[in-house]
A protein has these predicted regions:
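Acidic-glycine-rich active-site phosphate/pyrophosphate-binding loop
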Residues: 30-37, 88-94
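Active-site flanking loop/helix segments enriched in acidic
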Residues: 34-55, 99-103
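Extended, charge-rich intrinsically disordered regulatory tails
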Residues: 174-178, 183, 188-192, 206-210
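Divalent metal-dependent catalytic cores for phosphoryl transfer on phosphate-bearing substrates
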Residues: 55, 66-184
Length: 225
């Protein structure tokens, strides 16, 4: 619940009443909220453990806020919306049960389309929600995989969409590397080269530790079967 409380704290600072109402509609949904707290962010590769989706979402959100401090031309409310919602549909795409795999909705529709549908549904329930704002938020979700060959129905065409894609990819790669470090033998300087990258990776050794494999912000958890 600590991660969820931190997400709430960031969302509470959204200035646009329409964006705030939309994000609250997701976070307050009695079906979506418990699923969001429990869901993994993936079946393998990154944040592949119970609660991984909430952890990944918070990390991307925190990165988004730091980026907005550095680049004031970014719309912080849109960045917050994109970072929070980009993977929200995974609550319906992935089974939270160990070994559960993909749901039928996940296989037939996928989390990007599911999230876009949820945005349309939630926005329709908010009086006076601007249609163009809905389109821009939907674009953040539709474009967050970056390229069509990676599953994005649209490629980023706004600054905010480019940033959400980049931060999602960065946080996913950090978790993926961490899981490979964990799988390495104790004291090993390199991972096995049989991984999704097709190459051995130099194992990071966090300051103040004797074991290269461990350290970081909860990233070294066991992935789901």
């Amino acid at each position: 619940m600590e991660h969820f409380a931190q997400i709430r704290a960031l969302v509470s600072q959204v200035k646009s009443p329409h964006v705030r109402a939309l994000l609250d509609a997701f976070l307050d949904d009695p079906e979506l909220q418990p699923a969001f707290l429990k869901a993994p962010a993936a079946m393998r590769i990154h944040h592949a453990y119970l609660g991984g989706l909430c952890e990944h979402t918070l990390s991307v959100l925190q990165l988004g806020w730091r980026i907005c401090d550095h680049y004031p031309q970014l719309d912080r409310d849109l960045i917050t919306a994109g970072c929070l919602l980009h993977d929200f549909g995974k609550v319906r795409e992935l089974s939270p049960e160990p070994g559960g795999g993909y749901t039928d909705e996940g296989r037939l529709v996928g989390h990007i389309v599911t999230t876009c549908q949820l945005v349309r549904e939630k926005a329709a329930g908010i009086e006076g929600f601007p249609r163009e704002l809905e389109w821009r938020i939907t674009h953040l979700i539709a474009a967050h995989h970056g390229r069509r060959e990676y599953g994005s129905p649209k490629e980023p065409v706004t600054l905010e969409a480019m940033v959400v894609h980049a931060l999602d990819d960065l946080d996913s790669q950090m978790s993926a590397f961490a899981l490979l470090f964990q799988a390495a033998e104790a004291g090993a300087a390199w991972t096995d080269r049989k991984n999704q990258y097709g190459r051995a990776l130099a194992v990071a050794q966090p300051a103040g530790t004797d074991d290269r494999r461990f350290g970081g912000q909860g990233l070294y958890r066991r992935e789901m079967d």
